[in-house]
Each structure stands twice: as C-alpha cells, then as structure tokens.
C-alpha cells in the first residue's frame, strides 16, 4: 500500500456498491458509491455533464449516465464528488444518485463495473477502508455495523 502526496494510504483498486436499499416501490433515489484512485475517472467516463460544471470536492453535478455506445442515456443523475482526504474512506469518493427503480440501478451499476480498475465492494469494505486510513476506529465501525444490521428501530 502506497501513500498519496497528502499522506493518505492508497489501496490499488477502486470499489463500488449500491449504498441504498433497492426494491420495487421502495425508493425514488438510489446511491451508487465508488471509493478509490479510479473513482473520478470511472464516473467521468460513463457520465456526460451539460454546460460547464466544475468538478470540485463537495459539490453536486447534474448529468446523464451513458450506455457503452456513448449515445443512449441510461439515467438522469446527480453526482457528488468528495476528494481525498475529505471523505468517509479518506480516498476519492464519488456518488452517483440515480433513479431508484431496480432496472435503472442495475443498468447504472453495470456501467460502473464495466470500467477497468473498479470492482464490486465486499460487505463492510467502505468501513474497512475508513479504518485502514485512520478515519474510523474499530469501536465506531462495530457500532455502525450493528446499527446497519438491526431489523428494527426497537432494537437500537
């Protein structure tokens, strides 16, 4: 594992995952999150942004995810950019906020995973990267995991 110019450890791969629940009729918006050195390049490759929107950290951009042919618009999206080290994982993180329908999410996620240098995240891997990069301690990671896996609010 190498370090960036800012001293943040750099893991060699970029991970992606759907960060919101996706089920028929359960949500209007879904979030696909990427973290790692290729996050920006992947999203820039599959997305077109009208006008002259600046790609700045902690800003939202409006655009469309394009099919592999570069012409068909798969979905209208908002893209949130969080550059290292000012993100949950302390890596470059880019979120694609797309429509929440199952088909739309599958199509956008498939485009993300088609790109070289990106793979599907393992369960808990975003938190693992946050721990490895000093953004989260193990106690807080365990509490987050517990809250995410409880079936009801009554058990909190």
Regions found by a protein language model. Give the residues of each.
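A glycine-rich (often HGG/GG-containing) alpha/beta subdomain
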Residues: 1-148, 154
């Amino acid at each position: 594992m190498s370090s960036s110019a800012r001293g943040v450890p750099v893991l060699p791969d970029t991970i992606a995952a759907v960060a919101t629940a996706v089920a028929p009729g359960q949500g209007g918006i879904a979030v696909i999150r990427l973290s790692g050195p290729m996050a920006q390049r992947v999203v820039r490759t599959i997305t077109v942004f009208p006008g002259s929107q600046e790609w700045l950290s902690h800003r939202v951009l409006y655009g469309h995810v394009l099919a592999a042919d570069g012409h068909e618009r798969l979905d209208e999206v908002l893209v949130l950019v969080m550059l290292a080290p000012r993100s949950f994982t302390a890596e470059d993180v880019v979120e694609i906020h797309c429509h929440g329908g199952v088909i739309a999410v599958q199509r956008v996620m498939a485009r993300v995973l088609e790109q070289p240098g990106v793979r599907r995240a393992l369960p808990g891997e975003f938190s693992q990267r946050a721990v490895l990069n000093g953004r989260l301690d193990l106690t807080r990671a365990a509490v987050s995991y517990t809250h995410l896996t409880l079936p009801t609010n009554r058990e909190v």
